[in-house]
Amino acid sequence: MYRVRVFGDPVLRKRAKPVTKFDEALKRTIERMIETMYHYDGVGLAAPQVGISQRFFVMDVGNGPVAVINPEILEASPETEIAEEGCLSFPEIFVEIERSKRVKVRYQNVRGEFVEEELEGYPARVFQHEFDHLNGVLIIDRIKPAKRLLLRKRLMDIAKSARG
């Protein structure tokens, strides 16, 4: 199992690098990430959240775990919806985030094969959330400044814990 990195850890702000090797080490890393995600009752976990600055994440929105490697969002619907999101890198913080209702995505699986699919509703939201992590974008970047100000003390406490 991995230790989940929390707000304040610099790895969360970096743009992750593409995965180039689809080997046993990647499979083991993904298995460990899935174990970590379930341990913390998450529905998604991006590699940067466990200190790995590479473009992949795992998610499970009810149909079993999926590894998403080198993802792209090909299309995002103009229709959006607002819903509450949490993040393992922001313990006990939940904020309302506006995201596209539908996305058309392409990614590679653990064998390096390309997968293309359309996601709607909750699966689309989770995909977009985890995709943000690969670009160094966090949930607090997607909320209004006034709301961020209200969370300032809690964010500072989390950042302090990241430094040990």
From Swiss-Prot:
Keywords from the UniProt entry? Hydrolase, Iron, Metal-binding, Protein biosynthesis
Gene3D superfamilies associated with the record:
Peptide deformylase
Co-factor binding details: Binds 1 Fe(2+) ion.
Q: Which GO terms describe its molecular function?
A: metal ion binding; peptide deformylase activity
Name the enzyme group at the top EC level: hydrolase
- Reaction(s) this enzyme catalyzes, per UniProt: N-terminal N-formyl-L-methionyl-[peptide] + H2O = N-terminal L-methionyl-[peptide] + formate
Task: Look up the record and name the cofactor or cofactors this protein needs.
Answer: Fe(2+)
Which residues bind Fe cation per the record? C87, H129, H133
Tell me its EC number(s), please: 3.5.1.88
A Pfam family annotated for this UniProt entry: Pep_deformylase
What residues sit in the active site? E130
InterPro entries associated with the record? Peptide_deformylase, Peptide_deformylase_sf
- One GO process term, biological-process aspect: translation
Instruction: Outline what the protein does.
Output: Removes the formyl group from the N-terminal Met of newly synthesized proteins. Requires at least a dipeptide for an efficient rate of reaction. N-terminal L-methionine is a prerequisite for activity but the enzyme has broad specificity at other positions.
Family listed = Belongs to the polypeptide deformylase family.
PANTHER family per UniProt: PEPTIDE DEFORMYLASE
- According to UniProt, the name of this protein is Peptide deformylase
Q: Which organism is this entry from?
A: Thermotoga neapolitana (strain ATCC 49049 / DSM 4359 / NBRC 107923 / NS-E)
